[in-house]
Design a protein with these regions (language model features):
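Terminal targeting signals and extreme-terminal segments of soluble enzymes
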Residues: 1-243
Length: 243
């Protein structure tokens, strides 16, 4: 199954779409898949000239890979410059995702970027280590207990020319490693067995269009761990340093 297949949602009534997913090694569904499909469902209700600029998702229940996912889109607001959407993903057990997404009409304006791309080995010098057949992922060696990590990633198959489809690809990939970083800084990580962890929420800000088949550097760090939860913040850079 390719990413384009995951994004090929079937219409089931007004602003309602149905998708499916593959089986994953850990069972259940992968959070990045649900977010990517939710974003695609939201985009179906928005004119193509409006681009996604942010999304905020909450994972409510564990997804079932053997059952279809129903994405219900609520048109919160259609403005001149911004469109706001809410997406609820449901299965037979109830809602598994609640997501807000905001789309903006492209406009000219000043641009500044203060964050600099960190140093990292070139992707060609690193070994592929992706669990997904959809992406080529190459992690930069690091000290796990530091709570910091880097990885290059790129989409392996064509996803089309629509900007939102490339944003969906980034959304899919972005949920991949933050949880591993949280587990790595846990003081009992050496003695813990049968650890089960899942994303509780996920937010992405999109600053510019991207091409998912190109290399991107994911630089992330754990900022807090406690109470059975952890917080990881990450930045994604294009090879030229654009954020």
């Amino acid at each position: 199954m390719q990413l384009g297949d995951l994004l090929a949602l079937e219409p089931h009534g007004p602003d309602t779409w149905v998708g499916t997913g593959p089986s994953y090694p850990w069972g259940g569904l992968y959070g990045g898949q649900i977010v990517a499909q939710g974003l695609m469902a939201a985009a179906h209700s928005v004119p193509e000239e409006f681009a996604i600029h942010s999304l905020h998702a909450y994972f409510i229940r564990r997804g079932d890979a053997s059952a279809p996912i129903r994405f219900e889109v609520d048109r919160i607001r259609d403005g001149r410059s911004f469109f706001t959407r809410r997406v609820v993903a449901r299965q037979s057990t109830g809602a598994i995702l609640n997501m807000s997404a905001s789309f903006q009409l492209a406009e000219a304006g000043a641009e500044a970027q203060t964050i600099q791309m960190p140093d990292a080995p070139a992707p060609d010098s690193l070994k592929p280590d992706s669990w997904s057949p959809l992406f080529d992922r190459r992690q930069v060696p690091s000290t796990p207990e530091s709570g910091r990590g880097q990885a290059w990633f790129r989409l392996l198959n064509e996803v089309g020319d629509q900007s939102v489809r490339h944003a969906c690809a980034l959304a899919y990939a972005s949920d991949d490693m933050p949880m591993d970083a949280v587990i790595a800084v846990h003081p009992d990580r050496v003695t813990m067995k049968d650890v089960w962890a899942t994303s509780l929420d996920h937010a992405i800000w999109f600053h510019r269009p991207l091409r998912a088949e190109n290399w991107h550097l994911y630089d992330f760090a754990v900022h807090w761990l406690g109470g059975g939860r952890g917080l990881t913040l990450g930045h994604i850079f294009m090879p030229d340093g654009a954020h």
